[in-house]
């Protein structure tokens, strides 16, 4: 290398190079190469790249260092290249596979003390089946009792020492909240005292009054109920409601007085006082049954065997008969059935004569129940709780109970549970009670069909169901929908009333709106798999005969609430089972919308699913477009919203403040006859409105009186009970807005003034207009209630063309509205009945909290044998939001309240008084409330702020009003 040509930094400093010649030379070489390439292309196109590597200059960005995605993965794989990372940091690049699971389920079938084949065989013998609903007040021990039955039949399932098993609380939300939300079916085989096995289909129901719709669904498919009552608390709010509901459903009633350990360990009552407490509970229940039932033979008594005593916590359950049998097994040579008849009431044992007498032999003598049942029970509990080390082993040996040293070292509760379990054995007393006093499906079928089936009981189908015939035509009544573990699909749960349902069988599903005249609400489906449900696991079966409960796959799509499943062909006369009639009303209303409007379809799908899942839930769309959910209370709607957000739609949902539904009513008779003409001016209807007699609306809603009765029977009812004249009573056209609606339409026209034949021809149209009008009142589009509408005159066109439904129906609706507005309209609001349990020193605080919310106390009284008081009160539903939290704050958590819808009451003030000014963010005085409620409800629904009179009054009617100088508060 010549150093003179470069400087110290290596830069070239020599003479200029002859670059032009070099470029010409390079160009000639390139041209020659191109010609050679062309020749090679002609000879062999494929070998071009290999033989002659290109000498062209390739830019850095055009160089290919790696194979393309298409070369690596193939042309079938789509590859997406993004220039910018738009994924938020909170979202993983590769999302984990999420498995949605909302229920606690067993992974495999657990071991049972009986073979599954034996259970399946018992299903074919309907006389050995009992369909039972366990119901009772909140926390009175229903679920814990079922846990005892599960432990008895499933040797590997045991409750942990520190917490209850709660086997039927299968939802995670139920476990977290510590309260039952859904009714859960359990099917187990249980032996009676003689060792005979029976198949028990048991429905464990929630105790909270908000979820009484779940109880209704369970009662519909049961033949009897076992009513659970806490021995310390006695008959509570929901206990009374459930007694009434069971009697209305015509079910056999038995009672289990649970938690008797509380009398001993918590209240520390002497044995005699404990007996008085138990007898008081039995007497109270009998008093309620006699109040609601017409059957004088329906009496509950331990002597009859339809009352049992239990403590689920310590595995105690006995009837007088089963306790007497313990004596017979221990001492022998005792007729335990005769002995049991002498263990209740004012009967004493004389040890000298060894006979039972009705008179106490000495002043210190105890009643037989105290001496032979309570005192031994007290001694066992006292020994275990008090003196474990010294005298307990000897006492247990005398009772024939042998425990190991490890078992004797257990803590008090598990030790007490173990001792009682060994002493009392299995729950045979409970089985005896159910077998003797709750009918089998075969015996209970006829009254069940008469009460629930809308078709004829005398038809072939009715007789097959009454006989519980497994070979008859298929009839299955589903009352509940249970979602799958992931919340995607639903399975229908119901009872087979006749025939046998098979897996894979085509069936016809009849909805609640199906009639023989209108068959639109029906669909042919194919049954998927069939299961027998045992809470946390399901036993798959191929067929289920009449008398049994069944969980059905594949028929959920057309079912909304309840359904009737029958055969697709050859069963055309089949009618439906009537929809569930709930003992409460959904009056709390919330509006919902998705945070992201594009997710509205997901929310609508979620709303459809929660509507299936909750029996009494109502979802609807207002005219303003908002989606509204109606429920029975705050806890109920909280559970609904949890399921809607987490289970069924998985989206963020906004919820409006809760409000209540209102009703519209009148307090006077219409001030003048109101009339309306049809648009073609060929027909004219005249009506007036007046209030219904007190109690009549409730009778119609409770089906004490039915519009389907013949005119003579209907007339006699109104004449005798409500003092109507016979002509008016026999002229009732309809109830509204439906067959059990609290309004009446009466034809009060005279044959001398009106052509009855012509009027009869438009009767259906007038009734439709009346029902439409009473469904959406003029004040704020709410239900009209407690109003009697009288047709006073009618001019009807001779030609059928001029008196069609399109003319008559809207006119009838308009005249209903005008008559209503002329009769001093008022708003009605729902009132809750509240029951509060609190210590005596908290009673005054309860009064204070209620008074601040327009509530008032009706009764406060001590609970017998307990340090607590029961306060009964009424509170407006609209002022009840947050009441429970407020109450607990004021009583340091010592007061516990439950509230349930009770009645409708008129809101103070005139809703149409325009002189009232509603001031924002200020509580209104009582006389202004009706106006405030009406205006705010109308705004929420997207209606104009005031009632517009021109919509409801014809021009001739307005002229008539002007003539009579009627002052109206309404804007024109």
Swiss-Prot record:
Organism: Homo sapiens
Medical condition linked: Mandibulofacial dysostosis with microcephaly: A rare syndrome characterized by progressive microcephaly, midface and malar hypoplasia, micrognathia, microtia, dysplastic ears, preauricular skin tags, significant developmental delay, and speech delay. Many patients have major sequelae, including choanal atresia that results in respiratory difficulties, conductive hearing loss, and cleft palate.
Binding, GTP: 136-143, 204-208, 258-261
Domain tr-type G per the UniProt entry, residue ranges: 127-409
InterPro entries in the record: EFG_II (IPR041095), EFG_III/V (IPR035647), EFG_V-like (IPR000640), EFTu-like_2 (IPR004161), EFTUD2_N (IPR031950), P-loop_NTPase (IPR027417), Ribosomal_Su5_D2-typ_SF (IPR020568), Ribsml_uS5_D2-typ_fold_subgr (IPR014721)
Biased composition (Acidic residues): 17-26, 34-48
Subunit structure of this chain's protein: Component of the U5 snRNP and the U4/U6-U5 tri-snRNP complex, a building block of the spliceosome. The U4/U6-U5 tri-snRNP complex is composed of the U4, U6 and U5 snRNAs and at least PRPF3, PRPF4, PRPF6, PRPF8, PRPF31, SNRNP200, TXNL4A, SNRNP40, DDX23, CD2BP2, PPIH, SNU13, EFTUD2, SART1 and USP39. Component of the pre-catalytic, catalytic and post-catalytic spliceosome complexes. Component of the minor spliceosome, which splices U12-type introns. Within this complex, interacts with CRIPT. Interacts with ERBB4 and PRPF8. Interacts with PIH1D1.
Chain residue ranges for the region called Disordered: 1-54
Protein name: 116 kDa U5 small nuclear ribonucleoprotein component
Location of Phosphoserine modifications: 19
Chain positions with Phosphothreonine modification: 86
């Amino acid at each position: 290398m010549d150093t003179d040509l470069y400087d110290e930094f290596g830069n070239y400093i020599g003479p200029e190079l002859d670059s032009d010649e070099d470029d010409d030379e390079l160009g000639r070489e390139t041209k020659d190469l191109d010609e050679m390439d062309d020749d090679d292309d002609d000879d062999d196109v494929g070998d071009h790249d290999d033989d002659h590597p290109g000498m062209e200059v390739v830019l850095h960005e055009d160089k290919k260092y790696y194979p393309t995605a298409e070369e690596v993965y193939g042309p079938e794989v789509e590859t997406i290249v993004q220039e910018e990372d738009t994924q938020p940091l909170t979202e993983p690049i590769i999302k984990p596979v999420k498995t949605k699971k909302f229920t606690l389920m067993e992974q495999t079938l657990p071991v049972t003390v009986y073979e599954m084949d034996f259970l399946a065989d018992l299903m074919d013998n309907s006389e050995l089946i009992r369909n039972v609903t366990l119901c009772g007040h909140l926390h009175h021990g229903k679920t814990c009792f079922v846990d005892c039955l599960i432990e008895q039949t499933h040797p590997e399932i045991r409750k942990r020492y520190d917490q209850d098993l709660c086997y039927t609380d299968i939802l995670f939300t139920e476990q977290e909240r510590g309260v039952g939300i859904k009714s859960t079916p359990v099917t187990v085989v249980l032996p009676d005292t003689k060792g005979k096995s029976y198949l028990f289909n048991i429905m464990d129901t929630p105790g909270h009054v908000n979820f009484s719709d779940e109880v209704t669904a369970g009662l519909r498919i049961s033949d009897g109920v076992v009513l659970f009552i806490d021995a310390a608390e006695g008959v509570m709010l929901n206990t009374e409601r459930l007694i009434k509901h069971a009697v209305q459903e015509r079910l056999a009633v038995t009672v289990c007085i649970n938690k008797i350990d509380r009398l001993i360990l918590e209240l520390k009552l002497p044995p005699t006082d404990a007996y008085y407490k138990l007898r008081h509970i039995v007497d109270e229940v009998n008093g309620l049954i006699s109040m609601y039932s017409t059957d004088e033979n329906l009496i509950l008594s331990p002597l009859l065997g339809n009352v049992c005593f239990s403590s689920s916590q310590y595995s105690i359950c006995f009837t007088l008969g089963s306790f007497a049998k313990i004596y017979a097994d221990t001492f022998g040579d005792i007729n335990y059935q005769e002995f049991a008849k002498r263990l209740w009431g004012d009967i004493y044992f004389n040890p000298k004569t060894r006979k039972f007498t009705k008179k106490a032999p000495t002043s210190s003598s105890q009643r037989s129940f105290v001496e032979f049942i309570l005192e031994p029970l007290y001694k066992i509990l006292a020994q275990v709780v008090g003196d474990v080390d010294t005298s307990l082993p000897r006492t247990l040996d005398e009772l024939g109970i042998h425990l190991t040293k490890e078992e004797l070292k257990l803590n008090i509760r598990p030790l007490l549970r173990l001792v009682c379990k060994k002493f009392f054995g299995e729950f045979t007393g409970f089985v005896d009670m159910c077998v003797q006093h709750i009918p089998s499906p075969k015996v209970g079928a006829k009254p069940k069909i008469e009460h629930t089936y809308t078709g004829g009981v005398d038809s072939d189908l009715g007789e097959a169901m009454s006989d519980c015939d497994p070979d008859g035509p298929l009839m299955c009544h589903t009352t509940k929908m249970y979602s799958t573990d992931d919340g995607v699909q639903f399975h229908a749960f119901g009872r087979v009333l006749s025939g046998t349902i098979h897996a894979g069988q085509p069936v016809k599903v009849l909805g609640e709106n199906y009639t023989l005249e209108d068959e639109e609400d029906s669909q042919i489906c194919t049954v998927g798999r069939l299961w027998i449900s045992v809470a946390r696991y399901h036993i798959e079966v191929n067929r289920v005969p009449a008398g049994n409960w069944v969980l059905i796959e594949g028929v959920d799509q057309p079912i909304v609430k309840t359904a009737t499943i029958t055969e697709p062909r050859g069963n055309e006369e089949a009618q439906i089972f009537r929809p569930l009639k709930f003992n409460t009303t959904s009056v709390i209303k919330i509006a919902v919308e998705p945070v992201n409007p594009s997710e509205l379809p997901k929310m609508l799908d979620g709303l459809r699913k929660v509507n299936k899942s909750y029996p009494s839930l109502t979802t609807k769309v207002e005219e303003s477009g908002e989606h509204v959910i109606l429920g029975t209370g705050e806890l109920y709607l909280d559970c609904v919203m949890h399921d809607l957000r987490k289970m069924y739609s998985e989206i963020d949902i906004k919820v409006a403040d809760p409000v209540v539904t209102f009703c519209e009513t009148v307090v006077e008779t219409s001030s003048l006859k109101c009339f309306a003409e049809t648009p073609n001016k060929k027909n004219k209807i005249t009506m007036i409105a007046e209030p219904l007699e007190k109690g009549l609306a409730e009778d119609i809603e409770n089906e004490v009186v039915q519009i389907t009765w013949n005119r003579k029977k209907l007339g006699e009812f109104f004449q005798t009970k409500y003092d109507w004249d016979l002509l008016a009573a026999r002229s009732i056209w309809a109830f509204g807005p439906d067959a059990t609606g609290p309004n009446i339409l009466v034809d009060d026209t005279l044959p001398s003034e009106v052509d009855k034949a012509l009027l009869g021809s438009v009767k259906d149209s007038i009734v439709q207009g009346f029902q439409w009008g009473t469904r959406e009142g003029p004040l704020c589009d709410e239900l009209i209630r407690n109003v009697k509408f009288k047709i006073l005159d009618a001019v009807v066109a001779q030609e059928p063309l001029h008196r069609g439904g399109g003319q008559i129906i809207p006119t009838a609706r308009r005249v209903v509205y005008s008559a209503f507005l002329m009769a001093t309209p008022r708003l009605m609001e729902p009132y809750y009945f509240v029951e509060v349990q609190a210590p005596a020193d908290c009673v005054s605080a309860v009064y204070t909290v209620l008074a601040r919310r327009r509530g008032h106390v009706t009764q406060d009284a001590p609970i017998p044998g307990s340090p607590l008081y029961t306060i009964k009160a009424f509170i407006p539903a609209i002022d009840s939001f947050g009441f429970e939290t407020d109450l607990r704050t004021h009583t340091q958590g010592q007061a516990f309240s439950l509230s349930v819808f009770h009645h409708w009451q008129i809101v103070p003030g005139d809703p149409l008084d325009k002189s009232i000014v509603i001031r924002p963010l200020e509580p209104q005085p009582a006389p202004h409330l009706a106006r405030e409620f009406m205006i705010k409800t109308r705004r929420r629904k997207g209606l104009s702020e005031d009632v517009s009179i021109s919509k409801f009054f014809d021009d001739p009617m307005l002229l008539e009003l002007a003539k009579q100088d009627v002052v109206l508060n309404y804007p024109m």
